[in-house]
Amino acid sequence: MSVSTSVVKSMLQLTNYFGSNFTPKTETISSLAELWERHGSMIASMMSCDTREFGTADKFYEVIFRKIATTSLSFMTDSLEPKLAASGDSLEICKFYALFLEYMRKDHSGMLTRALEQASSENRVDTAVLLDMFLFFDNVYSESTADDWWACLRRDDEDQEASSGFRTPKRNNYSLTSLQTPTATARRLRTASSTARRSPIAEAVDSPTMKFMRSERELKQSKARIFGLEQMLGDLEDDKTKLSAENRTLKLSNSDLKSDIAKLKGIAEEAQFRAEELSCDLEAKKDEVHNILQQLNESRMTLRSEQRSLEEADIKKENLTAKLKTVTEDNGKLMKQARELRDLNDYEFARFRQQEQELTETLRATQDQMADLQEQLTGVEKIRASLKSENESLSASVEELSVASLRNKQDADNSKTMLSEELARFEETVDKLRQEKLEALSMANSRIDALRLEHSEREKMMKSTNARLQADLDEERNEKKRLMNLWNELNEKSLNVDKAVHKSNEEFQSMGSCLQNAKRQIEQLEVACKSKDDIIKFQEEQNKRAANLIKNEKAIRDQASAQFAEKLAILKNSLAEKENETVTLKENFASVVMKHKAELEEKELFLQSRVDLIQRLEHEVADLREKESAEIKKSTWMGERIKIFQQAPMRGSRIRCGSPDSLPDFLADNGPTITEEELRAQLATFPRKSIAPSVDDNEFDKGTPIGFKSNMYDGRESICSLDFFDRSSLQRSSMRSESIQLASPSSAGEFKQPFTPSGVTKERVGVLTARNEKVKPHLKCSYASEVGSTNSPSADEENIKKSKKKNRRDSIFSAFSSKKQ
C-alpha cells in the first residue's frame, strides 16, 4: 500500500509553513524528496541535532535516525530505513517526518500548537489529518505495542477510490427474499449460560425441600471451610510474622554484605588506582631514562661537532700562520728592497759628492766667469724658482708618501694587534665555551650556533683583514713603484740640473739646495727603513708570541680533552648507575605489581565468596519459602490429628497407637504394676528431654490430613511415634514453644521453652562435655552440631556410617520391663 495523498499534502504544507517562518527563510518544496536538501538544516536545528549541514541525503536521514533513537520514541525506530528514505521512498520519508512531528509534540508542544493554530487560522495547513495522526499515536501508546505504528500514513480504500476516480457501482439482481435476517431458536437451552455441573433434568426433578437441604448442607460445608480457612489464616499469619522477621534479618545481613562489598570495591578501586599510578610512574621513569639517553647522544654529537670545529680552527690557524709566514717573507723582500734602495742611495750620494767636488773645481774655474754670467742670473733665478717650486712639490709628495707609509704601517700594526686580540679573544671564548659545555650540556646547541656565527664572522673579519693587508701590500708595492718612478724622475731631473749647471754657473746654488733636499729625503728614507726594520722586528716578536700562544693553546686543548675524557667517563658511570637504578625500579615495580595483583585476586576471591554467600542466602530464602508451603501442609495435618486426639476417647487412641513408645498402650496391655507416685518418682530421676518436633525447622512432610494419601507406611499414626520426629540435638534445641514434652511432676502440662544458643562459650562446652560423659548422644554429629563446629569429623555422616556403632540407649520403658520380669 502506498502513502495517503492527504498525509503527504498536509506534511508538505506544514514544512513549507515552518520554512516561511524560519530564520533564515528556506525555499518551498513540492515533494518530500526535496526535504533533506532545502529543509534539512531547519529540521536538524528544531530537533537540536549536533550536525546541521548535510551534503547528502544519507547523512541527513542517518543523523535524524540517531537523534530519534536517543529520545522516548526509540521503540519505533526498528521500522525506519534511512537508506530507503535517502533514495526517495515516500513512505519512509513520511515515517521520518511523522516521528519528527511526534518529537515536536512531546518536547516542544507549545511551539507546535501555536504553529498549527496559526496555520489552520490562515488555511495554509490541513490540520485534521495531522490531528488524526496524533490521535493514532496516542492509541499506540495506550496499547503498548509499536507494530504497524505507521498504519495511519497508508492509503485507505476511500483514498484509492478517490485516486482512481469516483463512479457509481453496478446494480445487482438480488431478490429481496434472499436477504432475510436469520432469527434465533424458539427457546434457548438452559445450559447456554449456566455454570452448574448437574443436568437440567435433575434440576427440574428436585423438590423444594431437597433444594433447601442441599443449600443447608452447602452452607455447613462452606462454614466449616471458612472456619478451617480462618485457622489456616491464623497459622499462616504466624508463619508470615516469623518469615518476615527472618526476612528482615536476612535483609539486614544482605545490607551488611552489600556495605562490605561496597567497601571492598572501594579498596579494589584504590588498589587499581595505585597500580595505575605506579604504571604512570614507571612510564615517567622510562621517559626520563629515554631523555637522558637522548641528551647523552646529543652531548656526544655536540662534542664531536666541537672537536670538528676545533680541528677546523686548527686548520685555520695553520693557514693564518702560513699567511703570516708569507707576510714575513714579503717583509723580508721589502727589507731587501729597502737595503738595495739604501745602497743605491749611498752610491748616488757618493756620485753626488764626486760631482760636488767636480763642481767645486768647476766653480773655482768659473768664478772668473761670474761677472759675465750676471746677466744670465735672472733667467737662472726664474729657473731656480721653478725648480724650487718643483722641489717643494716633490718634498710635499715625499712627505705625503712618508705619511702614507706611516699610516699603512700603523694600519698593519693595528690589524696585527686586532688579529692578536681576536686570537686571544677567540681562545678565551673557546675556553669559556668548553667550560660552559662541560658544565651544562643542555645549552650546547645554542652555544654551538653562537660559536658558529661568531666563528663565521671572525672568518669573515680575518678574510677581510687578510684582503686589506694584501691590498695594503699591493698599495705599498705600488707606492714603491711610484717612489722608484719618482726616484727615476729625480735622477732625470738631477741630470737635467747637471746639464743646466754645466750650461751655467748660476745654477750651482740651486743644485746645492737640490742636493740638500735629496739628503733630507735620503735621511727620511733611512728613517723609514729603520721604522720598517722595527716593524719587522715587532712582527717577528708577534710571530714568536703567536707560536707560544699556539703551544699554550695546544697544551690547554690537551688538558681540556683530558678533562672532557674524565667527565665523559664520569657521565658513563652515572649512566650505568642510572640504568642499574632503572633495572632495580623495574624489578621493584614488577614486585609491587605482582603484590597488588595478588591482593586484587584475594579481594576478588573475597568478593566471590560474598557473592556466593548472597546466592546461598537467596537459596535459603527459596528453601524457607518451600518450608512455608510444607509448614502449611503440616499445620493442616497437625490440626486434623489434634482434633482426632481431642475428640476420640482413650481406647480409640489406644487402638490407633502402634508405637512401642506409647505409654497408654503399654499400661493397657500389662496393667498397672506400679502406682502413679512410684512412676512419677522414677520419671523424676531421668533428665527431661523433649520429644516434640520443631515444625518450623523440619523440611520433610511427616504426614497428610485425613482423606489424603499418606507418604508414610500405615503403621505410623501416633503423634508420639519415634519415627515421626528427627532425633537431632540441633532440632531438639530449637523447638517451638507449642511442642509437647514428657516432663517431671513439677512441670507436667507445661511446654518447654526452646533452647536458642547465643554462641559457643567455655561454660557451654563444659556443660556439653559433662552431659555427654554421663549420657552419650545418640548421634555423633549432635555434639559437633550443637557446638557449631562443622569441620569436626563427627559432623560428617560418612564418618558416622563407617565408624563403630554404639548400643542404643535404654528407653524409659526398660524400667517397666525389668520390674515386670
UniProtKB/Swiss-Prot annotation:
Residues 162-180 have a biased composition (Polar residues). It is found in: Cytoplasm, Cell cortex; Cytoplasm, Cytoskeleton, Spindle; Chromosome, Centromere, Kinetochore; Cytoplasm, Cytoskeleton, Microtubule organizing center, Centrosome. Disulfide bonds: none annotated. GO terms for cellular component: cell cortex; centrosome; condensed chromosome; cytoplasm; kinetochore; kinetochore microtubule; microtubule organizing center; mitotic spindle. The keyword Cytoplasm applies. Keywords: Cell cycle, Cell division, Centromere, Chromosome, Coiled coil, Cytoplasm, Cytoskeleton, Kinetochore, Mitosis. The keyword Cell division applies. Residues 211-634 form a coiled coil. GO terms for molecular function: dynein complex binding. Essential component of the spindle apparatus required for spindle positioning and chromosome movement. Acts to recruit or anchor gpr-1/gpr-2 complex to the spindle and cortex. Also involved, directly or indirectly, in cytokinesis and in the coupling of DNA replication, centrosome duplication and mitotic division. This is Spindle apparatus protein lin-5. It comes from Caenorhabditis elegans.
